[in-house]
């Protein structure tokens, strides 16, 4: 029997989401948090590098690049060729990431070279108290043997800031607009050169030096020291966080993070104010729904399919990576599970046609100050439940069949649901839905909880919609196989 997750027992779903968000400043940390929750709930980790030995009625997960995760529970009545019932979301959000050479010294300041990731509202990153988080590749030597590990790092205190230009030096900013040049304006300030020089850095060899003195240093094994690429002041903080010498840092993927924690807010405590709601809110709701829909052996007793959640990286930049939705990761998961029980390749093709994907990505709520940005008959409201997204040009993968099935689940469980199409005179965004629908051939509905300030450093959604999303996804896992048997489209 799966264990009750001690991390979430007795905690309201909105508070649990807050915990998830605050533990997940990056996609790497979100996957780490997801792994902890799955393991607490009896899920067993498998590796794509190994052969799989799967059993009916058991729960498993695997990760790719530690930024994508696929978790699944196999019904006790499953046979190869039966369907997969999947909720897919993504772990990444727009942010500013450190460049491979981030050391910038300019006008008496130490700045950090960054590049924008995704389509962020970059003006919202100005005048925020910023920290750094991500993953670091560390060299380890034990008993003369060298190995390398990846470690997650998070500096929680505010160490950087992107300051705006005073209005006295830009008199027309309020009339002409705040125009951000992401190459020259978006660099966070780390320290002044004078203070950095006074606050000397202890190098690995025991000498004391500043950035200029340690430039080009070599480690004991001859590799270029990271001080030649990054401010030693920053490296010292990273090394201190993960408990290694600065010279053992081989490489990293780091990003700037807002230090303000996620909160339940509003005069009626009805909102969640947070970064990365797009799309960690849907990632959390789908993950919790899967865990709770498979919490005991009895939940899988009469299940003839496989219940699955897939959380992908790199949606915000097109999904074309080894761990994005455009990669074979979804197809690989379906294929490996099916072939574990029967190697006949025809069964996978049958299974895909019996499968269903809920592509879950946050939706645009009607904005009270910009109501004209929504089509008059399609205005999703907060507290209105999940939004089903439609687009005639297939920017969303929803069709009448997939929309009907998802609405039927809502109707059975008395859950609200809404519809959305973008205005005809505005471009339409997209999701992992069309990518997986076309790449795998799986029936798909695109949905999402309504939110405001999408792609800002600080977004907002409604507490009620978190609850509705979780309940809708959980009902999908529990009811879909029975509901799907009642509709026939292709004979």
From Swiss-Prot:
<keyword id="KW-0479">Metal-binding</keyword>
<comment type="function">
    <text>Likely to play an important role in intracellular protein and peptide metabolism.</text>
</comment>
<comment type="subunit">
    <text>Tetrahedron-shaped homododecamer built from six homodimers.</text>
</comment>
<keyword id="KW-0378">Hydrolase</keyword>
<keyword id="KW-0963">Cytoplasm</keyword>
<dbReference type="Pfam" id="PF02127">
    <property type="entry name" value="Peptidase_M18"/>
</dbReference>
<feature type="binding site">
    <location>
        <position position="316"/>
    </location>
    <ligand>
        <name>Zn(2+) 2</name>
    </ligand>
</feature>
<dbReference type="InterPro" id="IPR001948">
    <property type="entry name" value="Peptidase_M18"/>
</dbReference>
<feature type="binding site">
    <location>
        <position position="396"/>
    </location>
    <ligand>
        <name>substrate</name>
    </ligand>
</feature>
<feature type="binding site">
    <location>
        <position position="364"/>
    </location>
    <ligand>
        <name>substrate</name>
    </ligand>
</feature>
<dbReference type="GO" id="GO:0008270">
    <property type="term" value="F:zinc ion binding"/>
</dbReference>
<keyword id="KW-0482">Metalloprotease</keyword>
<feature type="binding site">
    <location>
        <position position="361"/>
    </location>
    <ligand>
        <name>Zn(2+) 1</name>
    </ligand>
</feature>
<feature type="binding site">
    <location>
        <position position="278"/>
    </location>
    <ligand>
        <name>Zn(2+) 1</name>
    </ligand>
</feature>
<feature type="binding site">
    <location>
        <position position="361"/>
    </location>
    <ligand>
        <name>substrate</name>
    </ligand>
</feature>
<feature type="binding site">
    <location>
        <position position="278"/>
    </location>
    <ligand>
        <name>Zn(2+) 2</name>
    </ligand>
</feature>
<feature type="binding site">
    <location>
        <position position="455"/>
    </location>
    <ligand>
        <name>Zn(2+) 2</name>
    </ligand>
</feature>
<dbReference type="InterPro" id="IPR023358">
    <property type="entry name" value="Peptidase_M18_dom2"/>
</dbReference>
<keyword id="KW-0031">Aminopeptidase</keyword>
<dbReference type="GO" id="GO:0006508">
    <property type="term" value="P:proteolysis"/>
</dbReference>
<feature type="binding site">
    <location>
        <position position="389"/>
    </location>
    <ligand>
        <name>substrate</name>
    </ligand>
</feature>
<dbReference type="GO" id="GO:0008237">
    <property type="term" value="F:metallopeptidase activity"/>
</dbReference>
<feature type="binding site">
    <location>
        <position position="315"/>
    </location>
    <ligand>
        <name>substrate</name>
    </ligand>
</feature>
<keyword id="KW-0862">Zinc</keyword>
<keyword id="KW-0645">Protease</keyword>
<dbReference type="GO" id="GO:0004177">
    <property type="term" value="F:aminopeptidase activity"/>
</dbReference>
<dbReference type="GO" id="GO:0005737">
    <property type="term" value="C:cytoplasm"/>
</dbReference>
<comment type="similarity">
    <text>Belongs to the peptidase M18 family.</text>
</comment>
<protein>
    <recommendedName>
        <fullName>Probable aspartyl aminopeptidase</fullName>
        <ecNumber>3.4.11.21</ecNumber>
    </recommendedName>
</protein>
<feature type="binding site">
    <location>
        <position position="168"/>
    </location>
    <ligand>
        <name>substrate</name>
    </ligand>
</feature>
<feature type="binding site">
    <location>
        <position position="90"/>
    </location>
    <ligand>
        <name>Zn(2+) 1</name>
    </ligand>
</feature>
